[in-house]
Every structure is written in structure tokens, then in C-alpha cells.
UniProtKB/Swiss-Prot annotation:
Key words, A-Z: Cell membrane, Disulfide bond, Glycoprotein, Immunoglobulin domain, Membrane, Receptor, Repeat, Signal, Transmembrane, Transmembrane helix
Biological process according to GO: immune response-regulating signaling pathway
Subcellular location: Cell membrane
Matching SMART domains: IG
Cleavable signal peptide: 1-21
Protein name, per record: Killer cell immunoglobulin-like receptor 2DS4
Taxonomic lineage of the native organism: Eukaryota, Metazoa, Chordata, Craniata, Vertebrata
Family: Belongs to the immunoglobulin superfamily.
Organism of derivation: Homo sapiens (Human)
Sequence ranges assigned to domain Ig-like C2-type in this UniProt record: 42-107, 142-205
InterPro entries: Ig-like_dom_sf, Ig-like_fold, Ig-like_Receptors_ImmuneReg, Ig_sub, Immunoglobulin_dom
Known role: Receptor on natural killer (NK) cells for HLA-C alleles. Does not inhibit the activity of NK cells.
Region Disordered, residue ranges: 220-239, 280-304
Length: 304
């Protein structure tokens, strides 16, 4: 492989690295759904990505759909940059987990860290379940309360929402002795009331939910505090995202290629310089006449 081929390969590597998006250069933007992430069929929802970093562009990405990335130019107002992505009319193919990213001017391939995930759910596709409270919807402060969501439809999962809370609790459905599919949500000792609803979903379509149950108002008498324990996990996972920040990795890969490219260029320049010096030497200095050659051969024979 010639020197120029190696150099061109190194240059090509750097060009490819420059064209590949790099995540994690800036901190993550905020991400929310307006009016909310539970959307009825055929309705439209706005996904808003915003940050106090002056991003020039925002990207919207749906998990598992690499060809469905949307780009918008950011709007700048009062020290905040934002973009509003209109999603709709809502249908099952649009449901899923979304994230957004930001990029600054002159660096379109250097993306921010991903926002927290946002689950967009389409509701109203199946019949509504029933929601009840045990021992009842009105309880004394400190009394244990359980909310039961049930239906004759063979739902695999139930989701319990409370007005004012961003995330739902979820539990798998269990078939009861009376033939219904049920999930019991233990709320623990009652400290604060609220309005609850539940939804059902199937295992093979986790973002497609039933109609909402009728709202259930739970009232607490006595001396309630400001919150109710949340013994079950929320349906949205807001931990560390699965996206790997590749900026460090690509930098580590670039270092040896930079050294190699410098070495090859230095060697190539040295070879060119030596060749130029050789071309400038007098012809007499580079030739040996026949007499000198014969004399050297004779001396070599004499010393042998």
C-alpha cells in the first residue's frame, strides 16, 4: 500500500468522524407534552423541547425508529430556546417513547445529551375497566387503602393515574375466581385524597390503552399530609438513558490516527527532501571511474 493511499484513508476516516452525530456535548434539554402524554385517537399533541442553552436546532427521535427523526429550528425568547413538534392526528403508529436533542450553531453533528424519555400513549381503543376502593372511597387518615382495577377483557397490564401526577403506576393483571382480570394497587396508609383513573393494555401493544375508567374520588378525613406513598414503580423510566455518549470514544480513536498521519507526513516530507538533495549533487560525486573500481577490487583481493 503506497503512502498516498494510507494518507487518503486517514483523511477519509476523519471526514466520516466529522459527519457522524456525537451526543453529550451539551446538557440535556427539558421535554414535555402539551396538554399531556395520554392522547385520544385522532387528537393532536405538542411535544415541546426547550433549554436555557441557545440551541439552533432541535431533533425529535422516537425509540426504535431511526428514520423518524424530526428537525426544527429553535425559537429564542427571554434566554430560552425551544421548539414545538406537532404530533397528530394521534394513531397507534405514532405512540411510543420519545426523546429530544439540541445542537448549537456551526456544530450540527454535536448533539446535546438526550432529554428524559417521554412515553406518548394513545388511549380510548378498548372498553373501559372498573375502578373501586377498598375499604371504600372515604377513609380515615392512616387507614390502608387499595384501589382495584378490573375488567372482563383479558388485559395484561393495568395503569393507575392520579390527577396532578406526571406518571402512572402499573401492575400486571391477574385472573380472579369470578373470571375478571384484576390488579390491586395498595396505596398504603391514607394521608391525602385525590382523583384516580385506571386503564388496561395488552402485552404486545404497551402504548395502546383502553378508555379511562370512571373517575374515583378518594377522600381522607382527619389530618392529611401533602402526599401519598408511591409503592409501585411509575410506567415511565427516567433513569440513565440507554444512549451511549460517543464523544469520548471517538476522541480516543482519533488520537492514534492523528499520530499515524503525522508520522506518515513527516516521513513523506523527509523522503522528498532527500530526493531533492540527491538530484542536486554533482555527477562526479555519484560515479566511480573504472580505475578506482579496479584499484578497490585489487586492494580487496590483496587483503583477502
Amino acid at each position: 500500500m503506497s503512502l498516498m493511499v494510507i494518507i487518503m484513508a486517514c483523511v477519509g476516516f476523519f471526514l466520516l468522524q466529522g459527519a457522524w452525530p456525537q451526543e453529550g456535548v451539551h446538557r440535556k434539554p427539558s421535554f414535555l407534552a402539551l396538554p399531556g402524554h395520554l392522547v385520544k385517537s385522532e387528537e393532536t399533541v405538542i411535544l415541546q423541547c426547550w433549554s436555557d442553552v441557545m440551541f439552533e436546532h432541535f431533533l425529535l427521535h422516537r425509540e426504535g425508529k431511526f428514520n423518524n427523526t424530526l428537525h426544527l429550528i429553535g425559537e429564542h425568547h427571554d434566554g430560552v430556546s425551544k421548539a414545538n413538534f406537532s404530533i397528530g392526528p394521534m394513531m397507534p403508529v405514532l405512540a411510543g417513547t420519545y426523546r429530544c436533542y439540541g445542537s448549537v450553531p456551526h456544530s450540527p453533528y454535536q448533539l446535546s445529551a438526550p432529554s428524559d424519555p417521554l412515553d406518548m400513549v394513545i388511549i380510548g381503543l378498548y372498553e373501559k375497566p372498573s375502578l373501586s376502593a377498598q375499604p371504600g372511597p372515604t377513609v380515615q387518615a392512616g387507614e390502608n387503602v387499595t384501589l382495584s382495577c378490573s375488567s372482563r377483557s383479558s388485559y395484561d397490564m393495568y395503569h393507575l393515574s392520579r390527577e396532578g401526577e406526571a406518571h402512572e403506576r402499573r401492575l400486571p393483571a391477574v385472573r380472579s375466581i369470578n373470571g375478571t382480570f384484576q390488579a390491586d394497587f395498595p396505596l398504603g396508609p391514607a394521608t391525602h385524597g385525590g382523583t384516580y383513573r385506571c386503564f388496561g393494555s395488552f402485552r404486545d401493544a404497551p402504548y395502546e390503552w383502553s378508555n379511562s375508567s370512571d373517575p374515583l374520588l378518594v377522600s381522607v378525613t382527619g389530618n392529611p399530609s401533602n402526599s401519598w406513598p408511591s409503592p409501585t414503580e411509575p410506567s415511565s423510566k427516567t433513569g440513565n438513558p440507554r444512549h451511549l455518549h460517543v464523544l469520548i470514544g471517538t476522541s480516543v480513536v482519533k488520537i492514534p490516527f492523528t499520530i499515524l498521519l503525522f508520522f506518515l507526513l513527516h516521513r513523506w516530507c523527509s523522503d522528498k527532501k532527500n530526493a531533492a538533495v540527491m538530484d542536486q549533487e554533482p555527477a562526479g560525486n555519484r560515479t566511480v571511474n573504472s580505475e578506482d573500481s579496479d584499484e578497490q577490487d585489487h586492494q580487496e583481493v590483496s587483503y583477502a
